[in-house]
């Protein structure tokens, strides 16, 4: 078993006993499951029912749990803060150790709209402080993720990994860390012509979780057979795209945090092959590079 390696359950799927057993047999130690929508987290009753069923499914395995918050959850309003509080209840009931959260998920803007963006981001940050205090009391870490555009389009504040890292540092909470998504980093670094290894190195001390998947960067007219011709965030298996794994493996391999694979089902090889190849690219090669 690869103690740091995990695999996502697709947001539309339920982690059945057979699915979880297959993950464990392939060598994964972690599983990521998406929570119900915001409204159900706010309402509590249905959310907790879902969480308890998830815990029951996991109890027959040795898999450790990470839950992914709803993509549209952004602390900073009464409605969203209530849902975030329900998210913490959900994670505790399900026995999750980590929550993946999309912080700073606001469109970039100029002029008067820029002031509104700053205000909304400040409201989120203010709300996260007591929510993180509660997360800490529950033994849960909230990992805030750098994102990337699914298709070419408007930039969002969360597309800047350093902005996400700086939010984590300002929060200064033992229950807050960065979720460094390597696939997203590849897209945004390619778009800005930045060095992904340098950005990764600047963020590494604050990372509590990695997401790993591959893509073709911001594409720049690059195409490949068998994949969507215009999508950026392809979620290919590691090694199937153009992400420079050899340049990031040293930092990832030397880290102690989990590495969660998020691979689109239509591109996914056999689970044992996916686990072995991902471990070779990231964990084993990275550990060797760190020791050299």
Question: Where are the model-predicted features located?
Answer:
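Hydrophobic residues within beta-strands of alpha/beta enzymes
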Residues: 31-33, 99, 142, 210, ...
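Aromatic/hydrophobic pocket-lining residues that form the small-molecule binding cavity
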Residues: 16, 47, 51, 80-87, ...
């Amino acid at each position: 078993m690869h103690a740091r390696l995990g695999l996502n359950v697709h947001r539309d799927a339920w982690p059945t006993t057979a699915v979880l057993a297959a993950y464990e047999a392939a060598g994964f130690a972690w599983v990521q499951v998406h929570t119900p929508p915001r409204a159900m987290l706010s309402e509590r009753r249905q959310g907790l029912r879902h969480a308890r069923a998830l815990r029951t499914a996991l109890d027959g395995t040795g898999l450790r749990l990470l839950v992914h918050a709803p993509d549209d959850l952004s602390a900073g309003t009464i409605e969203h803060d209530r849902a975030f509080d329900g998210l913490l209840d959900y994670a505790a009931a399900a026995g999750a150790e980590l929550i993946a959260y999309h912080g700073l998920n606001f469109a970039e803007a100029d002029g008067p709209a820029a002031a509104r963006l700053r205000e909304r981001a400040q409201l989120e940050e203010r709300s996260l402080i007591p929510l993180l205090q509660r997360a800490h009391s529950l033994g849960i870490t909230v990992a805030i993720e750098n994102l990337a555009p699914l298709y070419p389009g408007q930039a969002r504040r969360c597309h800047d990994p350093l902005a996400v890292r700086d939010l984590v540092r300002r929060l200064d909470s033992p229950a807050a860390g960065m979720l460094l998504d390597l696939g997203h980093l590849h897209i945004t670094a390619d778009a800005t012509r930045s060095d992904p290894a340098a950005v990764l190195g600047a963020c590494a001390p604050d990372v509590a979780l990695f997401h790993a998947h591959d893509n073709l960067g911001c594409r720049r007219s690059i195409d490949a057979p068998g994949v969507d011709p215009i999508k950026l965030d392809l979620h290919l298996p590691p090694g199937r795209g153009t992400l420079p794994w050899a340049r990031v493996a040293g930092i990832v391999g030397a880290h102690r945090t989990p590495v969660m694979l998020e691979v689109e089902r239509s591109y996914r090889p056999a689970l044992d092959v996916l686990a072995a190849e991902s471990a070779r690219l990231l964990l084993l090669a990275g550990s060797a590079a760190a020791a050299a």
